[in-house]
């Protein structure tokens, strides 16, 4: 049986291992979760929320345990681990408060079809397969699992093999809530286990991962028409305009590029600075990079603010992109040194869009900075990407900042900051173009785990019901007249049936009949309304 080693990227030490799931485990898990779905979907929402709040309580009580595992598993500081937990519980807290509103049945206006009542209601899909990444292995799995459960689904979770210790931790936390654990199954393993989960015919697949993996799953799910939603890679641009607070742009831009060692899907991956402030920005951003303290500490009182890359594959990508850029004429103005998985925060200039560094996702602490003539050139270059996750715009002229923000082909724009839009729990987050089609955060996150169903409720059709009249043969003229009267755009269009009726002998009896029916209908409606009011 395959095992997944837990490796601390800062020290290279192995600190445990997990058993990978077998093909039989995958089949059984999906079968079990399909049965469990019949129980969970019938639980009233308030009971589901009670169970999920117990998990929220367990997470808060287990804070030190979680940050310790994240620290060993990814090399990030305990404080950065705390940020993951904080973002998770903030989201869960908001979702549980708002879910009764988001998930409730809603009446739909009847339009012309007044003799029935109509409503729509979000229903769960069934078994949701959640496939997670390693860069924020807690925050990018736990809230997704909880949202799917909140909506009434059961879940099969396949956490990343790179951070398998966090996957085991997530499994253990869920097991501590007996009310919840029968409705989630965690399957550990690498891409093969993920592929088997997708092939196992779940009712919905949710991936957070690379665009390359998204493409593979899109192909696999197309065969079975399984719905597939994905949060994928990014190449987020930052634009610094002439009216920017350059010191703030340098400080928070550097933070956005180097936070989590650059392994953040909406981290700053490319910077475009207008020529008027380019030299000043470069001077200040280098000064900011000099302040970054690299290192690893187990203690919560650590002095470092940047750890190692999380695993070897990331190092290879960073090295390959740097070599390609340098060979094509780029210049490192700060950093560039590599020691094990520790990569210095690196600022690189003279970059062009034919370099991999400006086109492909890097996911490392590398900040390429490019001088541009003006806002127009910055926008053109920022949009010259297959990705479209987030972007950052810097200007103290809010009209200009908003104008640029609205012309960026991305899912979210942050004006005068970086990354900080992500922790806002009710602000939808997700990509356009090849950055994916999912939305996390808020109502949109929870509702994407539901399918909207519609209901038309009433007694058998009445003779004067429009739906009955339109089904009768020889009612073409009548139907056309009703359409014009009801939906005519101009007064002339609306009045046309009346004019035609007055001129058309054939139509007169029909109009008379409709007028009588309308009279009866009005009386029935008036009686029904009076009865309803009397009952109230
Ligand atoms: P990855 O694509 O390598 O792996 C993601 C998950 O998919 C892992 O669990 C992996 O085992 C699984 N997987 C791989 N191949 C599979 C297959 N054929 N079928 C089913 N499952 C398969 O991504 P990663 O390296 O773990 O994560 C980093 C990537 O995720 C980056 O591209 C990053 O931008 C992206 N990401 C996006 C967001 C977002 O919200 N848009 C957030 C975080 C990370």
Residue positions per predicted region:
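Short, well-ordered beta-strand elements within core beta-sheets of diverse protein domains
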Residues: 15-21, 36-42, 130, 238-240, ...
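Short loop/turn microsegments at loop-to-beta-strand junctions
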Residues: 1-4, 268, 389
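Conserved C-terminal structural/oligomerization subdomain of aldehyde/semialdehyde dehydrogenase
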Residues: 8-17, 343-536
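Structural signal for hydrophobic packing residues in well-ordered secondary-structure cores
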Residues: 37, 41, 56-59, 63, ...
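Residue-level signal for inorganic ion chemistry
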Residues: 12, 48, 70, 92, ...
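Rossmann-like NAD(P) dinucleotide-binding subdomain of oxidoreductase/dehydrogenase enzymes
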Residues: 108-248, 499-501, 514-517, 521
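N-terminal Rossmann-like NAD(P)+-binding subdomain of aldehyde/semialdehyde dehydrogenases
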Residues: 1-117, 495-508, 517-532
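ALDH superfamily catalytic-core signature
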Residues: 15, 212-352, 381, 415
